[in-house]
Amino acid sequence: MMKRVLIKPLEPLMFRSQGEFEPLITGSHTAAQSLIIPRPSTIAGMLGYILFNKSSGTGDWLSDLTNLLDTIYGTFIETNGEYLFPLRMGNHLALVDQQHLINLPILLEKEYEQREKGIYELFYDKNKLFQIINHQDRIGISIDKSTRTVKEHYLYSARYLAFKKEVNYVIFIDNDAISDKINGKIVNFGGENRIAKLEVDDYKVDTSIEEEYYLTLSPILIPDEALDDLLDNISDYVTMGKVDKISLGFDIANTKRKEMLTAILEGSIVKRSIIDFIKKEINNNLLDRFTKYEKIGYNTLMNLCKLAFRKILS
């Protein structure tokens, strides 16, 4: 029996991606737009903040989190008792229910025209993203008192994530010990000190599946040494989705950026061969760190036909 954690937003949210505050960004105006699905480091950091004991800190953000948390699986959305899962085609993101994911393995084996028609219907007819997701735009400035003008680099616009319906983010954890410590907590969630409430309950779910195709519920991290091989043979591993560079966030305790890695983004459809590929490419020097990434939520694969998960390295 696992623990299901519902993260219930209490106000509009901001889940930053890389981009708006990168070293190469210059000019008088910076802008941020929230992700729809928070990245694993955001959720693990939120849980770690509740559980953190200063005396147990190691100075390494990843080790500190994995010492506090057991394996996290996720993330997807629940609204009105229905689960919605991310599905990605390039820059396009949809939220679809499992009833329509079930048809994907058959659809992916069809001829090109039939396959494209079926995928089009998923993204434009079956997509529930716009039924539940809204946005809230805000602008912030800083005034130079001496000139009464906006300071350079301090004109800031942000598009927050808002909701048309009651929405919960869903993750699963396999640790009974921490569930009582987090259940009912009001926590900061994402950027800009947004808040959410946590609710925990028991849930039976399989975490040892073998399938031909998987949905990625969180980014699948790729070591730099394997990137050329992956991109040269991308159709062997990724059926639809997107590969991109992502930031693992900001290390507040040490006031520095966390690492940036290449990833197959959440919502992608990958083949079983990606599992053997990553296992082969992660050498002994990388294994410990990439296993820790996996523990805090990265590399979550889901069965397309039922609510069942697996990781890649463990």
From Swiss-Prot:
InterPro entries: CRISPR-assoc_protein_Cmr3, CRISPR-Cmr3_IIIB, CRISPR_assoc_ribonuclease. Keywords: Antiviral defense, Cytoplasm. Belongs to the CRISPR system Cmr3 family. One of its GO terms (cellular component) is cytoplasm. The lineage of its organism: Archaea, Thermoproteota, Thermoprotei, Sulfolobales, Sulfolobaceae. This is CRISPR system CMR subunit Cmr3. GO terms for biological process: defense response to virus. It is found in: Cytoplasm. CRISPR (clustered regularly interspaced short palindromic repeat) is an adaptive immune system that provides protection against mobile genetic elements (viruses, transposable elements and conjugative plasmids). CRISPR clusters contain spacers, sequences complementary to antecedent mobile elements, and target invading nucleic acids. CRISPR clusters are transcribed and processed into CRISPR RNA (crRNA). The CMR complex degrades RNA complementary to the crRNA (target RNA) within UA dinucleotides, generating 3'-OH and 5'-phosphate ends. PANTHER family: CRISPR SYSTEM CMR SUBUNIT CMR3, CRISPR SYSTEM ENDORIBONUCLEASE CSX1-RELATED. Part of the CMR ribonucleoprotein complex, consisting of crRNA plus Cmr1/Cmr2/Cmr3/Cmr4/Cmr5/Cmr6 at 1:1 and possibly 3 Cmr7 dimers. A Cmr2/Cmr3/Cmr7 subcomplex without crRNA can also be isolated. It does not cleave target RNA. It comes from Saccharolobus solfataricus (strain ATCC 35092 / DSM 1617 / JCM 11322 / P2) (Sulfolobus solfataricus).
